Amino acid sequence: LVANATGCSSIYGGNLPTTPWAKNKDGRGPAWSNSLFEDNAEFGLGMRITADKQLAVARQLLQELKDELGEAYVKEILDAPQTLESELVTQHQRVDGLKAKLKDMHSSKAAHLLSVADQLVRRSVWLVGGDGWAYDIGYGGLDHALASGRNINILVLDTEVYSNTGGQSSKSTPTAATAKFAAGGKSGGKKDLAMQAISYGNVYVARVAFGANPQQALLAMREAEAHDGPSIILAYSHCIAHGYDLKNGLDQQHKAVASG
């Protein structure tokens, strides 16, 4: 489940006929949704709370039907590991079998479980947006989402300027950087969102730059997904507002990391 804040990522990620959000041969893939700029964190947190509630309902109904379905069969579904992709595929197959059984059962509980059975497969929730959302306009909601302790993943595409409105200086812009409204160089410092998240003690935090180290970026994504709790990845992102040809974007990421 993807909650995408309005901004550059929603424009290039949400327009047809091309889209980065794809489904596999079984018709399964990410469910993408776009929220307002200022409340995307709350929007994504709501997805997590809803998924958790529906899972609790499904598990309760499955327990109540263990006499009809078989206690061992119910236990297999409830206790199934769902960390690796292969384990999720197997759980999908279990749930498909469960739904086939439920269709032949004529009771209100079976019908109710059939409507929520898909929730027995683990849901991954990602909140995606830029630094204008995460560092500034949507920061209050983002902080609330991190403090909730819920199993959410946050990906911040950090260009260090307000990209969607033309490249203005923002709270993410580092000291002395030149941008619109800071032509002589920004006098203040860059907001340290990573340290603020770390202060909670239960949040997974990573900084990545795909162009500088793609292996580390992939590892951070996997670790964030595996962390049972809030996670946030601050991904340095190149942007047309930086003033260079974007065909050199990955090289610029490498230079940015090398320069500190």
Tell where the protein language model's regions lie, with residue ranges:
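N-terminal leader/propeptide and maturation segments of large enzyme subunits in energy/redox metabolism
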Residues: 36-112
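Thiamine diphosphate
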Residues: 1, 9-23, 103-168, 205, ...
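Active-site cofactor/cluster-binding pocket
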Residues: 16, 168, 175-180, 204, ...
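Segments that form or flank anion-binding pockets
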Residues: 4, 12-54
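Glycine/aspartate-rich loop-and-adjacent alpha/beta segment that forms the canonical ThDP
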Residues: 18-31, 214-260
